[in-house]
Structure formats: structure tokens, C-alpha cells
Amino acid sequence: MEQAQRSAEYIFQGTMYFFRREKILCRYQFALKDAVDPALLQRALDAALSAAPYYRVQLVQEKREAFLEPNPNPCLVYAGSAQRSIPEETNGYLFSVSCEGDTVYFDWYHFLMDGRGVSPFLTRILELYCNLRYGTAFANTPIVSSPAYDIEAMMAKYPAPEASESTL
């Protein structure tokens, strides 16, 4: 990935949580009306990821900088309700989808996305799952994501004020 496409400044803000001894994960859990079929949930996850490449990333560290880069590994649905060690036990992904009984669990690092940012992705997964499992006809609207954070463009658009005698 080109240096200009990397969003190091944004990622730097969140890596303090990533490298803590006690990792902080967010979790949503969804109780469905029937037992979850892991194979269908895997198909739904794969389809959702193909429509939302932002989530198909891994954290890459180079010296003192960290970047999100494409993750070529498969993103798997895991069995059970226990939180997995992310990214060590998730093929490098910064989130995890698992299921047990009638419940789907979704764990993620907050610096990748917040609750508002994760909602369209989770909705897409659940709608795709319901379409596969029950033959529903959810439309699966596109997931909109912002372009990569570009500090140079922001600084050019909003330059720092020049110092004057009154501010010295």
C-alpha cells in the first residue's frame, strides 16, 4: 500500500489500547430464534467482507508506526462464546465472529470501528445469514465507509495559524 493511503495518524491513536497488557474488546451478541448454523454464518461473513473491504484488514507495525493493510488470510466463524485473543487467534483480523446455540457474538477492537461504524457491517452479516437460513429478502444496502485519513490534505485545507505578537 502506498504511504499516502495509509492512515497512520488515526491508527496511532488506537494502538495504545491494542498493546495494553489487558486488552479491551467491544462485544455485541445477538440472540436468534433458532440455533445458529455455523456454515451459513461463515457464508454470510464471507459475502459481507467481499462488500466491505475496510474490515478485511490487519494491523502491520513498521518501527514506531502502525498501519491497516489488507489481510489475505481467511476470516473464520468460531464456535463458542469465549472471546478469542485478537489478532493472535483470528488470523490477524481485528474482530471475531463466533456462535453458540442461538447466539451470534461479535468482538472487535474499538480503534478499528466504533458501535456506529460496526452496526452496518453486523447488520449486513445478519441480513445475509437470514437470507440464507430463512429465505428472507433483505436488500443488503451498500456499506459506506469514509476514505482513508489523509493528514497532509487536512493540514493543507486547515493550515495552522501563524504566530503573532499577541500570541507569543
Predicted regions and their residues:
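Non-catalytic N-terminal regions of enzymes
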Residues: 1-160
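Flexible, P/S/T/G-rich "lid" or insertion loops adjacent to the active sites of thioester-utilizing
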Residues: 158-168
